[in-house]
Amino acid sequence: MSQIVDIRAREILDSRGNPTIEADVILESGVVGRACAPSGASTGSREALELRDGDKSRYLGKGVRTAVQNVNSSIHELLVGQSVFEQKALDEKMIAFDGTENKSKLGANATLAVSLAAAHAAAAEQKLPLFQYIANLRGQTTLTMPVPMMNILNGGAHADNTVDIQEFMIEPVGFTSFAEALRAGAEVFHSLKSVLKKQGLNTAVGDEGGFAPNLRSNEEAITVILQAIEQTGYKAGSDIMLALDCASSEFYKNGQYILEGEGNKSFTSNQFADYLAGLVKQYPIISIEDGLDESDWEGWSYLTSILGDKIQLVGDDLFVTNPKILQRGIDEKVGNSILIKYNQIGTLTETLDAIYLAKANGYTTVISHRSGETEDSTIADLAVGTAAGQIKTGSLCRSDRVSKYNQLLRIEELTKAVYRGKAEFKGLN
């Protein structure tokens, strides 16, 4: 009864009103697995290709009818008749048929939606929660609840304001359950709104639900968050730590890091690494993502040498969830953590390869959403099923973000999986 009898895809809308792809995998038993592909705003140049139609007469060129057709024809023909329990074989068939380095033939949005839908169908067929099915794929026996990396203040490509650093986040590390950590994060989020209002600042939110006020500097963004933490009654540096996503590739021009929001200040690689080290010394920052440009491996090496034993240095655009590129980072001792975005690589199997390669080499793993999301909450199950340790899924508003948090609450209720808090981090354990 595990045989795949039909695969269907459709064009749906994501949280930014852009088309994305949703796939159904239907089994002989009647079980249906369904999943959606997310979409990024700031993207690494080596990400797997998200196939868009380019037809300006539909959705301003962002339609995904070609990717949908690839599912309904090529992928349908490839996988119908196969056992849904053979996740690796299903994914490898799509990879081989595509035959390109970046899945440009089928589209990573097409392959990912089908890959995840197959996992949903297999879990349902076995009457298992998805997180348990994912755990079983790689023999993961210990399940943990992830520390949420909550993006409560936005800049850069995620907001229309004057702040250069893309995300200012909080991580509630000093709690004993995910539910308590989530509550603390929500309380700080609401406190931040009141802090911004008192200062006459904009409380509109960006793509990921974080506030996007016009602040004078990156440090001012940190300061208002610290005020919100204090106002809520929590202690920054013990209850709650800060995290940054610089998305530095967005302001790296001609070998210089240029902060336009701060009067076009210009930095060399080492100078910008030193600037970040100064922020870490001054503020309770435990994690920095994409501190330098994805091509600046020399700069990354320097950044790792000065901060790698103190805080988490996360590669997103740097590693693009690609095991081959991650292996280079491991070999060259660049970064100490990887952001996992499954649409950067295009299948569940390759995503798991990246996660377990990182874990085997002492790198921490952060499961992440994209700025263009849907109600699909698969990443919550992925975070628990791989004991990844951390999840990054936006702010404490917008149902496309909150759906993941709510799924984690349900999972915690089911499993009693441990919330490790500070123990997940380099520099805190």
Swiss-Prot record:
It is found in: Cytoplasm; Secreted; Cell surface. The gene is eno. Keywords: Cytoplasm, Glycolysis, Lyase, Magnesium, Metal-binding, Secreted. It catalyses: (2R)-2-phosphoglycerate = phosphoenolpyruvate + H2O. This is Enolase. Gene3D superfamilies: Enolase-like C-terminal domain, Enolase-like, N-terminal domain. CDD domains: enolase. InterPro entries: Enolase (IPR000941), Enolase-like_C_sf (IPR036849), Enolase-like_N (IPR029017), Enolase_C (IPR020810), Enolase_CS (IPR020809), Enolase_N (IPR020811). One of its GO terms (cellular component) is phosphopyruvate hydratase complex. Its main location: cytoplasm. Pathway: Carbohydrate degradation; glycolysis; pyruvate from D-glyceraldehyde 3-phosphate: step 4/5. Catalyzes the reversible conversion of 2-phosphoglycerate (2-PG) into phosphoenolpyruvate (PEP). It is essential for the degradation of carbohydrates via glycolysis. It comes from Acinetobacter baumannii (strain ATCC 17978 / DSM 105126 / CIP 53.77 / LMG 1025 / NCDC KC755 / 5377). Component of the RNA degradosome, a multiprotein complex involved in RNA processing and mRNA degradation.
